[in-house]
Amino acid sequence: MITKNLPLTDLHRHLDGNIRTKTILELGQKFGIALPAYDIESLTPHVQIVEAEPSLVAFLSKLDWGVAVLGDLDACRRVAYENVEDALNAQIDYAELRFSPYYMAMKHKLPVAGVVEAVVDGVQAGMRDFGIKANLIGIMSRTFGTDACQQELDAILSQKDHIVAVDLAGDELGQPGERFVSHFKQVRDAGLNVTVHAGEAAGAESMWQAIQELGATRIGHGVKAIHDPKLMDYLAENRIGIESCLTSNFQTSTVDSLANHPLKQFLDHGVLACLNTDDPAVEGIELPYEYEVAAPAAGLSQEQIRQAQINGLELAFISDAEKAELKEKVKDRV
């Protein structure tokens, strides 16, 4: 269960993986895009996981429909704005919304820097209207190669005052982190934090590389750390965060069952792991589900669930003063 008088955070939440079915339908119609169905009920199975059996291929095919309808920069702005409202509706006090501007721009050849600006505008408007605190993490999509990632990074850094970190996501096996060392030197030189998707498709060596060569202080998913005792010790001793996404890891076949997810062992070992959604619209879940259903199914005790919630605030890319402000805001909440 969620501890009400502690801030609830979602630090690993893809803005471009959380596009409402209704929005996909409306934007598809607006831009004359052929969709697999033309009402919400019929469209849902094409854009959201409804199958019981996990499948990475099915997951990714559903993910792509959201960005397929981003026909102009206003559509990107709308999606960013709605993401802030969705976070509010999920009882989240602080969200870090991550997005790949190249992925969002690709289908309709939008200007990548324009996408970043539109997302910043949408999130800032959402914060004003909904009173929730959110920050942005820019993603380099390694799947598209080093040159595309440099273009993406240039666009992200053009709005660096509105972005707290840069992430590397996508094809972990085909595009290993060593190809992006110079990119992340630019990130660190710009004063931004580093989080990297690692130890999801590839093994623990990918996590070592992200930490030691790219400068990651947080790792997205990181499930393969469990196979490397030295890495487990290093994560705990150096307070490297693990952004765990239980339902997502099951739906993408990263783990074969929630019961076999390593999150409980991470927490037992003193690793700073927290609970997050990943792509909530595609998964058909929200953050309360991760706390109330997925975490107990993964074997976490109530005390461990509470610890994961505490870890989420500690790992947030905000100042100690901002963390204290969030704590103060919710301390009397019941």
Curated annotation (Swiss-Prot):
It is an enzyme of class 3 (hydrolase). The active site is at E200 (proton donor). Gene3D superfamilies: Metal-dependent hydrolases. Belongs to the metallo-dependent hydrolases superfamily. Adenosine and AMP deaminases family. Adenosine deaminase subfamily. One of its GO terms (molecular function) is 2'-deoxyadenosine deaminase activity. The record marks H221 as: Important for catalytic activity. This is Adenosine deaminase. GO terms for biological process: adenosine catabolic process; hypoxanthine salvage; inosine biosynthetic process; nucleotide metabolic process; purine ribonucleoside monophosphate biosynthetic process. It comes from Vibrio parahaemolyticus serotype O3:K6 (strain RIMD 2210633). InterPro entries: A_deaminase (IPR028893), A_deaminase_dom (IPR001365), Ado/ade_deaminase (IPR006330), Metal_Hydrolase (IPR032466). Keywords: Hydrolase, Metal-binding, Nucleotide metabolism, Zinc. It catalyses: adenosine + H2O + H(+) = inosine + NH4(+); 2'-deoxyadenosine + H2O + H(+) = 2'-deoxyinosine + NH4(+). GO terms for cellular component: cytosol. Substrate binds at H14, D16, G170, D279. Its EC number is 3.5.4.4. Its cofactor is Zn(2+). Catalyzes the hydrolytic deamination of adenosine and 2-deoxyadenosine. Binds 1 zinc ion per subunit. Zn(2+) binds at H12, H14, H197, D278.
